[in-house]
A protein has these predicted regions:
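Central antiparallel beta-sheet cores of small beta-barrel/beta-sandwich binding domains
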Residues: 24-97
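Positively charged n-region of N-terminal signal peptides that target proteins for export
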Residues: 1-4
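Short, exposed beta-strand-loop hairpins at the edges of beta-sheets
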Residues: 97-121
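Cleavable N-terminal signal peptides
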Residues: 8-9, 19
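Sec/Tat signal peptide C-region and signal peptidase I cleavage site
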Residues: 15-21
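Short, solvent-exposed mixed-charge patches
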Residues: 128-129
């Protein structure tokens, strides 16, 4: 009986930990940019979140991009309400933008700006299951 109680308690703690994961954490598919898209893994990095390219695809299928392992989302700090602020790297022009991310269930809306917010670009990513 005691072993069952311990096993139930451990399972409850493990499941609660998974349920408490931040909404931004996980694997996401980027929107196509210059004909290519990527799978990005978002994980905690200190008190913020970072997203690293783990797989890349183009019209011919999966390919070994030199961008694999590079960080797209940089130090995204939670702002509450599913919003995050940090920096976003755009591989197609190798520029870093001031970034804002909003998570709504399995959709990530991202906006990257330069020149104090005068020039902005946006993308919508979807969570991979």
């Amino acid at each position: 009986m005691f072993k069952k109680l311990i096993a139930t308690a451990v399972a409850t703690v493990l499941l609660a930990g998974a349920a408490l994961a931040d909404p931004i954490e996980g694997f996401w598919q980027t929107e196509a940019d210059d004909g290519a898209f990527a799978f990005v893994e978002v994980v905690p990095c200190g008190e913020t979140y970072c997203g690293t390219i783990v797989r890349t695809f183009n019209a011919d299928g999966e390919y070994e991009s030199p961008n694999i392992g590079k960080m797209l989302l940089i130090e995204m700090a939670p702002q509450g309400g599913g919003e995050y602020k940090g920096n976003v790297w755009r591989p197609s022009n190798d520029k870093i933008y001031i970034g804002k991310v909003t998570i709504d269930a399995d959709v990530m809306k991202m906006r990257g700006c330069i020149a104090g917010g005068l020039l902005c670009s946006s993308q919508t990513w979807v969570r991979l299951q």
